């Protein structure tokens, strides 16, 4: 939720690959392969944000 609070105040959320790895304990496949990270983590997360919150990702 802290990340969403940052977004709410600025309208922009900036993160790093390393932060995502640490925060969400991503599997090694997503840590080493950005295409895999996007396909199996980021795209589904953005879809859920757009569908279930008033935020637009």
Curated annotation (Swiss-Prot):
Superkingdom of origin: Bacteria
Keyword entries, A-Z: Plasmid
Name recorded for this polypeptide: Uncharacterized 6.6 kDa protein
